[in-house]
Amino acid sequence: MTDLKAITSHFAISGEVAEIKPLGSGLINDTFLVTTRYPDTPDYVLQRINQAIFTDVPLLQENIRYITSRIRYHLQQRNANDIDRKTLTLVPATDERLYYYDGNSYWRLTIYIAGSKTFEQVTPDLAYQTGRAFGEFQYFLSDIPNPPIGATIPDFHNMEFRLGQFREAIARDKAARLAKVQPIVDELLGRSEEMCRAERLHREGKLPKRITHC
């Protein structure tokens, strides 16, 4: 069993760790809330990064560092209040890297935003607020034409690539279920030209690449 307190000791935290317990219901990384003993020191979010998905952890963390620094810069420029609640604060390891490798797993740490929560169901108001937040996110990053961001999962949002995978799966019909869903497959393939429009426009120089997440 992993000694989470020992893992946390490799980061430049303030205060004494009182408790570490699982946090949230995420499906990719293992996430823990690190509670410190006294109210004048922050709590933290500790994550074990899923290396099966994120194979280049240094790149992943550098992406996050760049993006959060740009968001923080723009918030400071507009004299926003409570900035530490509006963007992540990364906590470096004691060797100043933005992750710690224990010989088996990669770990990262951020300051916990008190009172933050996730929602399992989306209401119209939540969808609206999410749209506003995403629009602001795009605005904050739009002033850098070619941001130094690397692809942590190559072709993850490349619809042409994904449709190619889909067509291969159709040809294999590995689970012999194609006949049951053929109308849905036909409808999806009928929309393929529209679905790939963004990639075509980018190749033609008409649509810039945008950062969606790290």
Where are these regions (language model features)?
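Juxta-kinase regulatory segment immediately upstream of eukaryotic protein kinase catalytic domains
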Residues: 1-21, 67, 71
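ATP-binding glycine-rich phosphate-binding loop
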Residues: 13-38
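ATP-dependent phospho-/nucleotidyl transfer catalytic cores
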Residues: 21, 25, 47-58, 113-128, ...
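Conserved hydrophobic/aromatic beta-strand scaffold that supports enzyme active sites
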Residues: 31-33, 109, 211
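Short, well-ordered amphipathic alpha-helices
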Residues: 34, 64-73, 196-197
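Short beta-strand element of the conserved SAM-dependent methyltransferase core
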Residues: 34-36, 110, 188
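ATP-binding pocket architecture of kinase catalytic cores
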Residues: 41-65, 72-148
